[in-house]
Structures are given as structure tokens and as C-alpha cells.
């Protein structure tokens, strides 16, 4: 039976009748006035500014209100640490003086202190009783551990020492071969004056020589100029501004330790702020600059990524110690406007980079960009003028921030809608003067005339890009899209649409045809968007992967291996077409861009060709060369292939429409059921259907679509299973292109040779490639 634990006496001390001299404590509190309290100033959000004359706000806690008996002044009862120091000192001196007075003689012989000590002694005895059992248990455990350690030491001594055969004249040839395999010669970067650390990183990343935009921009940025850079997509604009930022970091913050103190964190400010129009581009910029930092020695730059869909609290913590900030305008403005002191930090940045500037600065988009730019240029009025502040202001005036602007299109006419009526600009590109006036109205440059760099003033498209046009009926775009996929079986394809609903439908349609399709649009959760991009761009992904996306993937995404771009819808603006097509043929690689054009879209396509290729067409016509490059080549698909594929597409569309209609119907029923529950009425789906049928929308706009959706959603499970079985049977066969299946040896075609050829295994027969 275990020993019963001794009980500790709770109240062993009794109050002494003799008044003792006791030190004054702040537990009881002091009665003070409102001006004697130690008020603390409340930090207001940066966005509040002066709030129409609001000067400030102070607060205090742990204070009780003491109301006077008559009409006297209201007092406050506060602890000693809530009172101002000079007031607290005077109160403590008065208290000690009063406590030191003689209080008379008591009849009690034993003082209270002795009783307290005796109670403590009893407590320590109880502790000793408990610790003896604990010590016995600990000693047993320790002895077991010691025995195990002794056995392990004996076993280690018994084992013979490993023998190493040391050979004379060790060669480092294997090490040299490994280094040569990982790194490349970067002597082409020497004229730009880049540091050895960054050259090491460029060598590991296999960037042997700079691109034209990098050669032109890096020296100007390093010398302190504002730069506006225009270059075609995939020309390396990220490194054009990333390398000078890291060079500044090496010169000023190379040996700077990581700050942990609040005062040090509050005094630190970021070096650069990089704005991006989309989350995917912001993540890509962060990935590229991080790779440049991690592969370079002595560069420990901390990069903060501020995008929507992720935790705000985590981003605020990372921002406190960041050197480079990359973000989208919406989330960046939310963090700055609700934070304390963040706006003052960002006003001290050295580099402001606006990537894809024509999109960020376009009219009617990204209102937060204007607010951010206005906040960065705002000067505080209410501050104390001291010598330190004056010196800081002088330093800020001596070294204001550099503004760096990059994009592939600066032509304002390219942002006009292609469809509809209206007056259109000519297709010529903006010259240097017009582009500078367009940007000077939006941005506050440090220099009167920033340096404008245009490495391809004539053509906006990549040199190795092939552009094609497929004319098809509007209701058969799915058929022609699937046919193009069959012509390019081992090509990584990016399909662009103008709506989110089209992305959802096409993704399900292609998946029903056993094609590895992924979706990407702005309504997806951020983790789902990142997952789609990662699966599509992974080196281990299927080489036939298809990404169906809206224009969120049109700008800045640098995914290696994209061979084909298909425009399912004609883009709304010409600059969108330029950036869509720029996802392929990047960094001297080749690629194709094919536009599916319906008869009602021919006007928009003609305007598109006039805007994008006007300068190149004019230059080619004025040249003496006989060959003239057409803007968009017409692509002719084999009609036999389209006829053979049509049954597959029809079955896949029926299955897809049924799934989408059923999903839409269930969501509508859920909404009506929840609304009926809120109103307290019974929900009957058949009654609602009868009422809707009575109203009738057969001839109105959308009536036919609703009828088709209802018919597609009313299919039974058996009918859907039958359609899937038929489609599965068709997909299991090759598309026959002129081979007799009944008499295999009667024709002039050698079927065995066709099966042995390792070409396009989708077709059975000779099918020509799409060459344009």
C-alpha cells in the first residue's frame, strides 16, 4: 500500500496583535489624479493619417474609478507601475515615513515572522519526504542507462577499426568533371561589372551570357538611373532588375545579422518593392530571385511574398525582417494600410519595380496601385523637428528610390477591345516620346526623363514563334480543339479561354477524352492554383499535359517546355494576345500559337493582326527581300480526321454537359432549400419546377440553353454509363486513316510497317504534320 501523502496546513500564521513595520506594496493601489497616471500612446494605422484633426489616442489598463462622496474631483485607484515615476516615488516616501512610526506594545510573545518560518519548515519536510521516493526511482533509471552505455563501449572496442587504402597521388579529375557538369562559363557577364558572388550563382543556374535587355539595363540601373525596359516575352527581364538589387544588397547589407529585437526590426526597412499583377507571377518572381540568392555565397537576403489566398499574419511576420518584398497590389495595400509603421518603412525603399506595367497601370484596373504609389510619395506633416529627423530627411533627399518599369507592351492602343464598334487607333507602336509621356503621368520618377530601353522596337512577338489561324464554326470549337491535340501528342499545351465557365467545361471535356488536363482560374483557391501550376510544370509530369486557363496565366509565367499555345477564344485585347503567345518560344526556344476563329470573330482577328503585326508587315514590305512573312498563317486540318473524331467528341460533350448540369441543379436546389429554411416554409422542387414552367422562357434569351441544360441533367445513371462505355470503346481504338480493317492483306498499305513505326500512335495510317 502506498504511503499517504502528507497534507500541508493552509493557514499556519496568525495575525499578530503588534503592529509590525511592513514594506509598502503596490497591490492595494494608490489614489491618484488623471494627470498622474502613466498613459501609453496607441499606435494608429498608417492609413488613418490625421483623421480630420484627430491628434492622438492614449490608453491605460488596470485602473479602478474612485467616485468622490460630494462634488469633488474623480480619482483613480492604480497599481504602482501604472503611476508616473515621480508621483510613485513621492507616494512611496510618504508611505515609508508613516510605516516607521511606533505603534505600541502587544501582549503576544512570539512574533508573526517566527510563525511564518515554522510553517515554511513544515513545508520543506514534506518536500523531503516526496523527494526520497523520486531519488530512488531516478537512481534505478540512471543505473540502467549506465549499464547500456558500458555494454555499447565494450562492443565498440571489440570491433576492428576500418582499413582505408590510401593511394599516393590522389587525382581531382572526378571533382573537376562534376563541377564542369553543374556550372557554365560566365565570362560573357564580365563587361557588366557583376560581382563574383552573383557570377557564381549565374554559373550554377547555367546562364552563360546576358540577353540584350540585361546588357542594356543592368549598367544603367547600377549607375542609379530610372529605367523603362521593353522587350519581348521570355527575354530575361526578371534578372535585368534582380541582379542590380542584389548588387546593392552586397554593398550595403552583406554582413548585417538577422535582427531579433523589436527596436532593431522597427528601424530596418526593405531595399526593394516589386509589384506584380497576378499571384502566379509573384510566386515566380520570388522563386527566381530566391534561386539567385541561394546559389550565391554571402547573400542572405530575406524575401517576403505578399499575395492573396495565404495567411496575413505569417506574411506580416516575414515582412518585419525582409530585404526584398514581392507582392500583388491588393494584399500589399491591405498589409500596409492596417499595419503600424509599415508605410514609413516602405517610404525608405531604394528600388520600386513595376513588372508588367501596362497591366498594372491600365485605366480601371488595380486601384490599390494608385493608393500605394500615392502613399509612398506622401510626406508626413505632424512630426517633431529635431536634428536627427532633419539629417534623415536630408539623407532621404540625397538618395531617393529608383523606379524600374518593365513590360513587353507599352502601346495604349493594344489595350483597346477588339470586338464591337468604335474608333480604333492605328497599329503603329508607340515611339519613345509617347511611351514616356504615358508613364510619366502615372509614376513619379526621380529623373525628369528616365532611360527608355527598347531592344525590339519593330516586332513584339518572339522570333522563333510560329502563329497559325484555324477557321471553324462557333459550335464546333471543341471538335477542332481535340483534333489539334491529336496532331500534337507529346506536346505540353496551354489553352486560353475568356471565361471561368469555359475553363471548367473544357477541363472536364478533355479529361473525359483521357487527356491529362488541368484547370487554372481566379476563382480557385490559392493552394489549388499553385498545385495546378506545379503539376503542369514539373519535370516528371506527363509530356502531353494540358493546362486550361484564363488570362491569369497570360503574363509572366515562365514554364519550361510549353510547345503549343491554343487560343480557344479570340482575346479581348491585342496586348493579351502578345502575352498569351509569349508563354512559348521563350529564351531562343521555338513554339507555336494557334488561334481558333469563328465567323463572327473574324473582325476581331483582323484588328488583332493589324495592331500586333502592322510594324513588322510595313518593314517587310519596304525591304528588298522577295519573301514576305504573313502575320497569321492559315492552318488546314484534314477533313477525314475531323470526320473520324466527331463521334468521340459528341459522346464526351454529352457526358460533360450532364455532369455540369447536374452540379448546377444541385447547387440551385441547395440555395432554394436554404432560402426556404430561412423563411420557414416547405421546399418542394417539383412545385418550383411547375411554377418556372408556367412562366415560360422558351423564346427569350437563354431559354434554349436552359432547355438543353434541363435535358442533359435529366439523364439517368444507366444512360450515362452507356455513353461512357461507348466512349471507352472508341478511345481504345486507333483512328483509321484509309486502312481496310476487314481485308488486312488486300490493300497496298503495309499495316505491319505502320504499327512498327514509333510516330503518332493515335492514327492508323498516313497523316501529315501541321507545318506552318
Swiss-Prot record:
<dbReference type="GO" id="GO:0016887">
    <property type="term" value="F:ATP hydrolysis activity"/>
</dbReference>
<feature type="region of interest" description="Disordered">
    <location>
        <begin position="1"/>
        <end position="27"/>
    </location>
</feature>
<keyword id="KW-0347">Helicase</keyword>
<dbReference type="InterPro" id="IPR000629">
    <property type="entry name" value="RNA-helicase_DEAD-box_CS"/>
</dbReference>
<protein>
    <recommendedName>
        <fullName>ATP-dependent RNA helicase MAK5</fullName>
        <ecNumber>3.6.4.13</ecNumber>
    </recommendedName>
</protein>
<keyword id="KW-0539">Nucleus</keyword>
<dbReference type="GO" id="GO:0006364">
    <property type="term" value="P:rRNA processing"/>
</dbReference>
<dbReference type="InterPro" id="IPR011545">
    <property type="entry name" value="DEAD/DEAH_box_helicase_dom"/>
</dbReference>
<dbReference type="Pfam" id="PF00271">
    <property type="entry name" value="Helicase_C"/>
</dbReference>
<keyword id="KW-0067">ATP-binding</keyword>
<feature type="short sequence motif" description="DEAD box">
    <location>
        <begin position="355"/>
        <end position="358"/>
    </location>
</feature>
<feature type="binding site">
    <location>
        <begin position="231"/>
        <end position="238"/>
    </location>
    <ligand>
        <name>ATP</name>
    </ligand>
</feature>
<dbReference type="GO" id="GO:0005730">
    <property type="term" value="C:nucleolus"/>
</dbReference>
<dbReference type="GO" id="GO:0005524">
    <property type="term" value="F:ATP binding"/>
</dbReference>
<feature type="compositionally biased region" description="Basic and acidic residues">
    <location>
        <begin position="125"/>
        <end position="137"/>
    </location>
</feature>
<dbReference type="GO" id="GO:0003723">
    <property type="term" value="F:RNA binding"/>
</dbReference>
<feature type="region of interest" description="Disordered">
    <location>
        <begin position="690"/>
        <end position="715"/>
    </location>
</feature>
<dbReference type="InterPro" id="IPR027417">
    <property type="entry name" value="P-loop_NTPase"/>
</dbReference>
<comment type="similarity">
    <text>Belongs to the DEAD box helicase family. DDX24/MAK5 subfamily.</text>
</comment>
<comment type="function">
    <text>ATP-binding RNA helicase involved in the biogenesis of 60S ribosomal subunits and is required for the normal formation of 25S and 5.8S rRNAs.</text>
</comment>
<dbReference type="InterPro" id="IPR014001">
    <property type="entry name" value="Helicase_ATP-bd"/>
</dbReference>
<keyword id="KW-0547">Nucleotide-binding</keyword>
<dbReference type="GO" id="GO:0003724">
    <property type="term" value="F:RNA helicase activity"/>
</dbReference>
<dbReference type="InterPro" id="IPR001650">
    <property type="entry name" value="Helicase_C-like"/>
</dbReference>
<dbReference type="InterPro" id="IPR014014">
    <property type="entry name" value="RNA_helicase_DEAD_Q_motif"/>
</dbReference>
<feature type="region of interest" description="Disordered">
    <location>
        <begin position="88"/>
        <end position="146"/>
    </location>
</feature>
<dbReference type="Pfam" id="PF00270">
    <property type="entry name" value="DEAD"/>
</dbReference>
<feature type="short sequence motif" description="Q motif">
    <location>
        <begin position="187"/>
        <end position="215"/>
    </location>
</feature>
<feature type="domain" description="Helicase ATP-binding">
    <location>
        <begin position="218"/>
        <end position="428"/>
    </location>
</feature>
<keyword id="KW-0694">RNA-binding</keyword>
<keyword id="KW-0698">rRNA processing</keyword>
<feature type="domain" description="Helicase C-terminal">
    <location>
        <begin position="480"/>
        <end position="638"/>
    </location>
</feature>
<keyword id="KW-0378">Hydrolase</keyword>
<keyword id="KW-0690">Ribosome biogenesis</keyword>
Amino acid at each position: 500500500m502506498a504511503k499517504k501523502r502528507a497534507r500541508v496546513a493552509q493557514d499556519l500564521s496568525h495575525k499578530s496583535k503588534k503592529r509590525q513595520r511592513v514594506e509598502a506594496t503596490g497591490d492595494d493601489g494608490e489614489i491618484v489624479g488623471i494627470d498622474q497616471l502613466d498613459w501609453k500612446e496607441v499606435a494608429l494605422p498608417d492609413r488613418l493619417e490625421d483623421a480630420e484633426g484627430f491628434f492622438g489616442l492614449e490608453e491605460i489598463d488596470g485602473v479602478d474609478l474612485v467616485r468622490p462622496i460630494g462634488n469633488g474631483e474623480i480619482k483613480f485607484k492604480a497599481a504602482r507601475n501604472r503611476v508616473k515615476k515621480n508621483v510613485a516615488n513621492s507616494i512611496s516616501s510618504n508611505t515609508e515615513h508613516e510605516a516607521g512610526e511606533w505603534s505600541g506594545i502587544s501582549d503576544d510573545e512570539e512574533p508573526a515572522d517566527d510563525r511564518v518560518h515554522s510553517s515554511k519548515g513544515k513545508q520543506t519536510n514534506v518536500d523531503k519526504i516526496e523527494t526520497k521516493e523520486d531519488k530512488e526511482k531516478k537512481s534505478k533509471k540512471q543505473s540502467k542507462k549506465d549499464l547500456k552505455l558500458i555494454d555499447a563501449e565494450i562492443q565498440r572496442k571489440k570491433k576492428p577499426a576500418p582499413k582505408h587504402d590510401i593511394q599516393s597521388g590522389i587525382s581531382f579529375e572526378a571533382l573537376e568533371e562534376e563541377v564542369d557538369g553543374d556550372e557554365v562559363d560566365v565570362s560573357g557577364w564580365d563587361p557588366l561589372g557583376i560581382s563574383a558572388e552573383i557570377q557564381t550563382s549565374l554559373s550554377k543556374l547555367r546562364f552563360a551570357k546576358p540577353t540584350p535587355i540585361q546588357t542594356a539595363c543592368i549598367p544603367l540601373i547600377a549607375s542609379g538611373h530610372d529605367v523603362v525596359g521593353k522587350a519581348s516575352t521570355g527575354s530575361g527581364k526578371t534578372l535585368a532588375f534582380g541582379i542590380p538589387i542584389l548588387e546593392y544588397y552586397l554593398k550595403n547589407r552583406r554582413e548585417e545579422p538577422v535582427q531579433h529585437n523589436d527596436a532593431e526590426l522597427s528601424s530596418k526597412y526593405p531595399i526593394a518593392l516589386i509589384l506584380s499583377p497576378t499571384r502566379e507571377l509573384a510566386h515566380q518572381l520570388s522563386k527566381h530571385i530566391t534561386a539567385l540568392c541561394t546559389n550565391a555565397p554571402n547573400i542572405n537576403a530575406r524575401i517576403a511574398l505578399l499575395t492573396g489566398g495565404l495567411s496575413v499574419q505569417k506574411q506580416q511576420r516575414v515582412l518585419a525582417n525582409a530585404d526584398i518584398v514581392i507582392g500583388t497590389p491588393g494584399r500589399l495595400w491591405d498589409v500596409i494600410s492596417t499595419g503600424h509603421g509599415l508605410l514609413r518603412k516602405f517610404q525608405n525603399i531604394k528600388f520600386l519595380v513595376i513588372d508588367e506595367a501596362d497591366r498594372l497601370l491600365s485605366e480601371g484596373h488595380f486601384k490599390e496601385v494608385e493608393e500605394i504609389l500615392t502613399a509612398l510619395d506622401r510626406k508626413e506633416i505632424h512630426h517633431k523637428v529635431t536634428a536627427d529627423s532633419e539629417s534623415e530627411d536630408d539623407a532621404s533627399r540625397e538618395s531617393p528610390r529608383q523606379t524600374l518599369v518593365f513590360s513587353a507592351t507599352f502601346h495604349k492602343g493594344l489595350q483597346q477591345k477588339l470586338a464591337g464598334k468604335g474608333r480604333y487607333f492605328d497599329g503603329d507602336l508607340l515611339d519613345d516620346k509617347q511611351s514616356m509621356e504615358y508613364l510619366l503621368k502615372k509614376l513619379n520618377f526621380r529623373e525628369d526623363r528616365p532611360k527608355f530601353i527598347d531592344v525590339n522596337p519593330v516586332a513584339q512577338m518572339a522570333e522563333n514563334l510560329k502563329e497559325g489561324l484555324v477557321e471553324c464554326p462557333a459550335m464546333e470549337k471543341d471538335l477542332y480543339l481535340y483534333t489539334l491535340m491529336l496532331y500534337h501528342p507529346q506536346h505540353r499545351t496551354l489553352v486560353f479561354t475568356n471565361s471561368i465557365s469555359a475553363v471548367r467545361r473544357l477541363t472536364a471535356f478533355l479529361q473525359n477524352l483521357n487527356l491529362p488536363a488541368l484547370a487554372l482560374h481566379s476563382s480557385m483557391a490559392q493552394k489549388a492554383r499553385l498545385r495546378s501550376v506545379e503539376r503542369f510544370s514539373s519535370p516528371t509530369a506527363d509530356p502531353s499535359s494540358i493546362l486550361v486557363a484564363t488570362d491569369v496565366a497570360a503574363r509572366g509565367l515562365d514554364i519550361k517546355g510549353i510547345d503549343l499555345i491554343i487560343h480557344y477564344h479570340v482575346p479581348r485585347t491585342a496586348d493579351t494576345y502578345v502575352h498569351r503567345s509569349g508563354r512559348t518560344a521563350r529564351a531562343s526556344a521555338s513554339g507555336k500559337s494557334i488561334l481558333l476563329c469563328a465567323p463572327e470573330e473574324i473582325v476581331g482577328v483582323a484588328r488583332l493582326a493589324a495592331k500586333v503585326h502592322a510594324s513588322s508587315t510595313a518593314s517587310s514590305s519596304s525591304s528588298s527581300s522577295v519573301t514576305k512573312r504573313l502575320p497569321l498563317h492559315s492552318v488546314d486540318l484534314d477533313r477525314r480526321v475531323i470526320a473520324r473524331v466527331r463521334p468521340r467528341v459528341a459522346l464526351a460533350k454529352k457526358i460533360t454537359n450532364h455532369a455540369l448540369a447536374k452540379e448546377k441543379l444541385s447547387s440551385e436546389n441547395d440555395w432554394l432549400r436554404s432560402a426556404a429554411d430561412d423563411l420557414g416554409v416547405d421546399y418542394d422542387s417539383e412545385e418550383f419546377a411547375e411554377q418556372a414552367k408556367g412562366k415560360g422562357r422558351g423564346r427569350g434569351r437563354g431559354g434554349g440553353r436552359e432547355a438543353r441544360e434541363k435535358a442533359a441533367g435529366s439523364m439517368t445513371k444507366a444512360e450515362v454509363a452507356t455513353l461512357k462505355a461507348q466512349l471507352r470503346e472508341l478511345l481504345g481504338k486507333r483512328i483509321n486513316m484509309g486502312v481496310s480493317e476487314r481485308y488486312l492483306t488486300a490493300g497496298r498499305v503495309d499495316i505491319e510497317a505502320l504499327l512498327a513505326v514509333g510516330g503518332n500512335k493515335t492514327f492508323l495510317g498516313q497523316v501529315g504534320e501541321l507545318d506552318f
